[in-house]
């Protein structure tokens, strides 16, 4: 039975009804993660990558209080420049829906909406996590608890390097979230392939990840999994190089009194300037890379045959081969993606 608060793009609804692979995509990257026009261009490019790897893309957002699973082109264009759009996590989602507001969905909110829609795989850039200075602020992203409670696989390039990565991994372990390095023994750090920390698990094919998900469900453990997919080597910013720039940006945020949800957008904006635009180009590359793997995982989960590249071979930068081991402003209306 359709959920009364969800509106599906026709293509997404048809795919779900047919049991075809679908990949959820967040909308915060459009409203808060990238400048215009790269934000909208990237959203379209990521959707194209999902299609090329055999799945249907479903960008998630809240428009005038309705949860949209898949966005028509005119709404995507509008989101790219809209100003009255909230950044929604678990705590904000019911308010935005009840009040008829507009909102873009973070990792946590996208997971919730994807699960309600029957979508099991979600591609994003990087998750939130434990913020630096947490002993003073208690600033921990809701993404982490959502991974522990909502059964969706999140494919990302690790946690954002602006965070306290050791504590983020510790928190995920405590909450029982499997963290899988895809074809790597190292936990990636968004712009960099190696955070300096080991990946808790390693799997080398989408089919192996799908088997992990099925087994977790069979054991009735609840919650999702995190798939950490390193940025392609040609696109990365080495960890040592980005670390100094992050330290500068963090110091600037503290000096300016930036806190809460405003921290991540501020730091990303500062890093865009400090890297001369490289952080944005790397971000775009890693999101596409994650979208390819997410689509392959969705295909593997459905047991469907993709008409695109063989599973495991389509992700940019991936090395093919066998596994080595296991009253807001009015939004435009429209139907269709």
Swiss-Prot record:
Compositionally skewed regions (Low complexity) per UniProt: 306-325
EC number(s) per entry: 4.2.1.70
One Pfam family in the UniProt entry: Indigoidine_A
Active site: 26, 160
Binding residues for substrate: 87, 107, 141-143
Co-factor remark: Binds 1 Mn(2+) ion per subunit.
GO molecular function: hydrolase activity, acting on glycosyl bonds; metal ion binding; pseudouridylate synthase activity
Alphabetical GO biological process terms: nucleobase catabolic process
Swiss-Prot/TrEMBL catalytic activity: D-ribose 5-phosphate + uracil = psi-UMP + H2O
This protein's UniProt keywords: Glycosidase, Hydrolase, Lyase, Manganese, Metal-binding
Disulfide bonds: none
Chain residues that bind Mn(2+): 139
Superkingdom, taxonomy of origin: Bacteria
Family: Belongs to the pseudouridine-5'-phosphate glycosidase family.
Record's function text: Catalyzes the reversible cleavage of pseudouridine 5'-phosphate (PsiMP) to ribose 5-phosphate and uracil. Functions biologically in the cleavage direction, as part of a pseudouridine degradation pathway.
Name of the protein described by the UniProt record: Pseudouridine-5'-phosphate glycosidase
Organism: Methylobacterium nodulans (strain LMG 21967 / CNCM I-2342 / ORS 2060)
């Amino acid at each position: 039975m359709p959920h009364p608060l969800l509106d599906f793009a026709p293509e997404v609804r048809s795919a779900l009804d047919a049991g075809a692979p679908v990949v959820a995509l967040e909308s915060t990257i459009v409203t808060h993660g990238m400048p215009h026009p790269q934000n909208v261009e990237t959203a379209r490019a990521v959707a194209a990558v999902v299609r090329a790897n055999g799945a249907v893309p479903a960008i998630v957002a809240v428009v005038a209080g309705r949860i949209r699973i898949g966005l028509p082109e005119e709404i995507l264009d509008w989101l790219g420049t809209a100003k009255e759009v909230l950044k929604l996590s678990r705590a904000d989602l019911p308010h935005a829906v009840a009040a008829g507001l507009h909102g873009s969905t973070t990792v946590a909110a996208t997971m919730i909406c994807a699960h309600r829609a029957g979508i099991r795989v979600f591609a994003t850039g990087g998750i939130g996590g434990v913020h630096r200075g947490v002993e003073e602020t208690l600033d921990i992203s809701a993404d982490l608890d959502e991974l522990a409670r909502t059964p969706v696989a999140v494919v990302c390039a690790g946690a954002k390097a602006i965070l306290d990565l050791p504590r983020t991994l510790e928190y995920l372990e405590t909450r029982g979230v499997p963290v899988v390095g895809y074809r790597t023994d190292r936990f990636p750090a968004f712009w960099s392939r190696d955070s300096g920390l080991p990946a808790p698990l390693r799997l080398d094919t989408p089919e192996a990840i799908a088997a992990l998900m099925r087994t977790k469900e069979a054991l009735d453990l609840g919650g999702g999994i995190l798939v950490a997919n390193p940025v392609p080597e040609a696109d990365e910013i080495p960890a040592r190089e980005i670390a100094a720039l992050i330290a500068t940006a963090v110091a600037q945020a503290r000096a300016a009194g930036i806190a809460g949800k405003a921290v991540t957008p501020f730091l990303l904006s500062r890093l865009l300037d400090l890297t001369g635009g490289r952080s944005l180009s790397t971000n775009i590359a890693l999101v596409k890379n994650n979208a390819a793997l997410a689509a392959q995982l969705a295909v593997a989960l459905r047991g469907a045959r993709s008409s695109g590249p063989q599973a495991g071979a389509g992700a940019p930068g991936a090395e093919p081969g066998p596994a080595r081991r296991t009253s807001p402003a009015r939004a435009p209306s429209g139907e269709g993606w």
